[in-house]
């Protein structure tokens, strides 16, 4: 993606160099390596802008082509966070900036499969690898409807990420009101009624920042 093709201007200021990722692969065990035995430095390191990338949904380093996925939202959000303007964008839209932190590095962890599905094992593997890598922040623009306060075996992973010093940011969801997921149908509950259960999981967990 050309939005992520521009590398940070100060190589000494980046958190991860290619040598750093190589050292992690040599000294620690990632779920990525267990999912794809062919995982190596050259398959997960893309550039100083994207020092790590893995497709947890399909269990391989290959992300496929743009035509293979129904979920481009993560790429959109990554652009808002750390995207860089291309010369074409600058000329066509008269823009001076794109991402909020254009010098930031991106660790890309794909957790949606080609059908638009995301399962707990994808997420848990990705988050635990994020802990192993020692990332600063994790953004999750995802969630299941009417999330619980606690979900055994899942909540603990998010707690561990926060305890490791990772700022875990999760989208609150777009359900609007409880009736959206009601067994009785939307028409049985007025949208003006006081509602509950509108936050999605994992945004309901105590240890995350939900926006």
Which residues fall in each region the model found?
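Subtilisin-like serine protease catalytic core
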Residues: 1-119, 133-136, 163, 178, ...
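Substrate-binding/access-modulating region of protease and related hydrolase catalytic domains
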Residues: 61-62, 69, 84, 108-207
């Amino acid at each position: 993606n050309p939005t992520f093709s521009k590398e940070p201007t100060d190589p000494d200021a980046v958190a991860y160099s290619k040598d750093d990722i190589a050292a992690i692969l040599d000294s620690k065990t990632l779920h990525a390596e267990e999912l794809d035995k062919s995982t190596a430095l050259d398959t997960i390191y893309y550039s100083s802008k994207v020092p790590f990338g893995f497709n947890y949904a399909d269990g391989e380093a290959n992300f496929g082509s743009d035509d293979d996925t129904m979920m481009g939202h993560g790429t959109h959000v990554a652009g808002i966070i750390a995207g860089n303007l291309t010369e074409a964008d600058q000329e066509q839209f008269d823009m001076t900036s794109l991402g909020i932190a254009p010098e930031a590095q991106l660790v890309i962890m794909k957790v949606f499969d080609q059908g638009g599905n995301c399962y707990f094992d994808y997420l848990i593997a990705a988050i635990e690898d994020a802990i192993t890598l020692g990332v600063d922040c994790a953004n999750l623009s995802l969630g299941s409807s009417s999330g619980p306060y606690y979900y055994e075996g899942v909540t603990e992973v998010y707690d561990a990420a926060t305890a490791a010093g990772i700022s875990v940011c999760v989208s609150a969801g777009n359900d609007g009101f409880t009736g959206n997921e009601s067994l009785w149908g939307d028409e049985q509950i007025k949208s003006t009624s006081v509602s509950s259960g509108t936050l999605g999981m994992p945004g309901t967990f105590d240890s995350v920042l939900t926006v």
